Amino acid sequence: IGYEPEKELKFKKDELIAGRYQYEKELGDAAFSTAVQCFDIKEKRYVCIKIIKNNKDYFDQSIDEIKLLRYINANGDPDKKCFLRVYDYFYYKEHLMIVSELLKDNLYDFYKYLTDNNNTEYFSVERIQKLTKQILICLEFIHDLKIIHCDLKPENILMKSITDATCKVIDFGSSCFVHDHLSAYIQSRSYRAPEVILGCRYDYKIDMWSLGCILAEIYTGNVLFQNDSIQSMLARIIGICGPIPNWMYEKGKLVNDFFTKEKLLYMEPNAVDNNESMNQTKKY
């Protein structure tokens, strides 16, 4: 595989990608990819193309994501199971590209848009319940396939229909099988389960923790566990949820970075979170 000096690929309006996808506009930019809206001139439909930035590590991770997306799409209906429908993937101008259905804003951007326009009535209890049910349907489906999402957050839940309050779960780039060698650096910090923070072995329950944090956030308008430091986040978790379970103290490889032998939190952070992309604090 060759890698050009330019890490990002830019297109002009109406330019054809791979002779089939007519470029419309950029939708968003992430750490290792850019999402663009295109019109598929063959199938006569709008699509989203995720363009992976030109970097070997990003490429390798995206290949793993494609394999997982193919597996998930082959085992269930994306509409019934509320996950992203993938149409195609290909290599173009030394960039890997993933073509999927075009959805609307993610939960974070949508909520921010509503609050910026003084309209917070959309997220009623009834609508939150409806959205929650769809996310749970997706989680039940992937968990039955022995897959942990590992990065559930408002940015990874996209609205399908604002009117109908329908949504889909996206971004399986950090996902893994429960029997895999599990990574210590997963989940965005505000949605990170305590067993992950403390270096314990984890399973499907970490997705449920993230979902609980998301629901509290869209109901109250505030991030439940602000990520100014892991130390203060653990203090908030203990304050809201109660003491850390004994098994986490016993099994956690990172417990000594945060707690004394008396199970008291150190006053100052004693560990560095190496996942720099997870250090952003959100404000509505």
Each PLM stretch: what is its role?
Residues 244-284:
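C-terminal lobe substrate-recognition/regulatory segment of protein kinase catalytic domains
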Residues 81, 94-97, 102-164:
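Conserved alphaE helix
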Residues 75-88:
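Conserved HxN/HPN-centered segment at the entrance to the catalytic loop
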